[in-house]
Amino acid sequence: LNPKYIINTHWHDDHTRGNEDLAKELSVKIVQHNASQLKNDLTVSDGDSIKFGCSELAVYHTPGHSKDSICLVGDGKIFSGDTLFVGNCGRIDLPGGSAKELYHGLFDVIANLSDDLVLYPGHDYGSSSTSTIGKEKQTNPVMQKMNEDSFVDRMGG
């Protein structure tokens, strides 16, 4: 295994602590969304791709949990950081959080992706460590069809 990048799905310390030291040790680049204020080597925006070996990850900007939250999609998988969990979604009560932005990330972006994508969230809070977008649309309370105002009320924000 020859890593090329460390990709931060958002700036929160539980996802980025130690990444600068690890990047130096492995001689790899740190990648994150251009809205992040953390030190990085490469920034990405919505619609960009990160290429490595024979693979490629498409970048989807999904703010809401934080301003710089991204999801990465490739090879039948979605790495959702703290935007979407199995059975839930990321908090909005931290700096940069926004229920309205999270609503649009979940319903305008993620809900329109293939139901077959295997979900790999940033934390294992659910009954399983992985799921699919289709299953989350069926069973995850935050992915049930609702309007923006209802979602914002549900999230308390």
Positions of PLM-derived features:
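Metallo-beta-lactamase
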Residues: E56, K67-G156
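Ligand/cofactor pocket segment of small-molecule handling proteins
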Residues: S49, H61, C71
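Short strand-turn motif at the edge of the Rossmann-like AdoMet-binding core
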Residues: A35, T62, T83
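A generic local structural motif
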Residues: T16-N19, S45, H65-S66, H104-D108
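Histidine-centered catalytic micro-motifs
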Residues: I6-T16, Y60-D68, L119-G126
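Active-site HxH/HxHxD metal-binding segment of metal-dependent hydrolases
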Residues: L1-A58, Q138-V142
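Hydrophobic residues at beta-strand termini and immediately following loops
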Residues: V44, T62, I133
